[in-house]
Amino acid sequence: MRTIVFLIVSILLLSSAVLMLAEGNAASHELQEYPIEESLEEQRKCVDGSCDPYSSDAPRCCGSQICQCIFFVPCYCKYRGK
């Protein structure tokens, strides 16, 4: 009975270790596809203030901000959830 429990626990631990390694490899592959230089370049192109969601030429809001427009008030960048 003990050997069966030991075998089952060993299989579970081994399978979870394999899944964790596979997940880590996938994450490192995603990081390689999206280099830091591109991320920094995108941050330089964003704006922290006014924005225009209807123009493709206008700079977009930075990071976790969204462009919000209310009737006649000019559009501005605001943090999500606030």
UniProtKB/Swiss-Prot annotation:
The modification Arginine amide is found at R80. GO terms for molecular function: toxin activity. It is found in: Secreted. It comes from the Eukaryota. Expressed by the venom gland. Keywords: Amidation, Disulfide bond, Knottin, Neurotoxin, Secreted, Signal, Toxin. Residues 27-44 form a propeptide. Disulfide bonds join C46-C62, C51-C67, C61-C77, C69-C75. Residues 1-26 form the signal peptide. The keyword Zinc-finger does not apply. The keyword ATP-binding does not apply. One of its GO terms (cellular component) is extracellular region. The presence of a 'disulfide through disulfide knot' structurally defines this protein as a knottin. Induces flaccid paralysis when injected into lepidopteran larvae. Intracranial injection into mice causes awkwardness of movement and laboured respiration until death. Belongs to the rTX family. This is U7-hexatoxin-Mg1a. The lineage of its organism: Eukaryota, Metazoa, Ecdysozoa, Arthropoda, Chelicerata.
